[in-house]
């Protein structure tokens, strides 16, 4: 059990999970998931003998779910040495973590970590035997990448760890990096020197990468997996279309039909959430800052309003933006009694959770894990799900296996690219022909039959018979 295990700075533990006896249960669900993840299984078949990842030390910071377990075992099957942690304190499925630990992979993750635990787990996953670091990273949200970069900066100027920060996760990150710096003053420079690159899973992490690149601070090459069509137009859209409702239902058992649902943001995630809630019979209001996305929402029949107008009308609120302060405390003050507030963006700063917790006279009653009822002094209350973190993973089990196979097939291909080729420091995307191949690998499973171009047809539109079929700038 986790509470009996040591937590020294650089641990020699083979793993740290909630309960290793859950491994058999986890293995049964992994076996089921494999049948729903044809892309990953095809990569095992294609590359299992050649092992293109032999010699790779892959660190993963990505939700430790059943689906991720299939990804991890694919990377291992292709020859990699793997260490793993979760990228969210609530998203780990403990039976999945146990099964992976039992298979011999070093995993440091359990559901309900605190933030000190979280960064400790990230550090352990970055620490390979012999004091080595990874040479490739699978990241989701950019926290592993950030730990290396902040640690690297601190080795140049320790004062960066004393700068005033307000977010608790940054406070805890700086605290553990101070301990690392005291013990090893060149660790992160050595790690960065051996890094061949990182592949980033989600919108938030990609924003961080581009920002570091623009500032000239990016230390190693990066693949933007999020913007592969077979990731963003499937995982973000179709995955959220199913997993949002799953999270809300498991947390609250609420009837969605007839309710007013406010979806903040109409990007790929917001589109999936809006259509999901409407399919249940809700009246959906959308908030947007982008005129193009706002027009798309309006043309789909959604009412586009401001949060100032929506906060008194909604029964359920969902943030999907990847930005900060989307639902503020002054919005929550005006909400209906027992309004449900949740987030499906990567971080917990879309909702002003800290301001809610420190609101004068507020009373918090925990209903069950990841469901808290906050009573305001005027008597009205709101239900906050997953403490403002990802509701689909905090209150349910995330996206279904099939759609995650798309994303994780992209991740595996990106890892092969980064490990086997030398890239200049920049942010890259997978080429179009690989995007199409990822889609192709999933067609047979759902009974799709492709039409094949004739040579004359291909020549007429200026493409190869076997693709790629669209220009890089094509919008799907």
Curated annotation (Swiss-Prot):
SMART domains: AdoHcyase, AdoHcyase_NAD. Binds 1 NAD(+) per subunit. The keyword Cytoplasm applies. One of its GO terms (biological process) is L-homocysteine biosynthetic process. GO terms for molecular function: adenosylhomocysteinase activity. It comes from the Bacteria. It is an enzyme of class 3 (hydrolase). Substrate binds at residues 65, 140, 201, 231, 235. It catalyses: S-adenosyl-L-homocysteine + H2O = L-homocysteine + adenosine. Keywords: Cytoplasm, Hydrolase, NAD, One-carbon metabolism. Its EC number is 3.13.2.1. Its cofactor is NAD(+). Pfam families: AdoHcyase, AdoHcyase_NAD. PROSITE patterns: ADOHCYASE_1, ADOHCYASE_2. The keyword NAD applies. May play a key role in the regulation of the intracellular concentration of adenosylhomocysteine. Belongs to the adenosylhomocysteinase family. This is Adenosylhomocysteinase. It comes from Bacteroides thetaiotaomicron (strain ATCC 29148 / DSM 2079 / JCM 5827 / CCUG 10774 / NCTC 10582 / VPI-5482 / E50). The lineage of its organism: Bacteria, Pseudomonadati, Bacteroidota, Bacteroidia, Bacteroidales. The gene is ahcY.
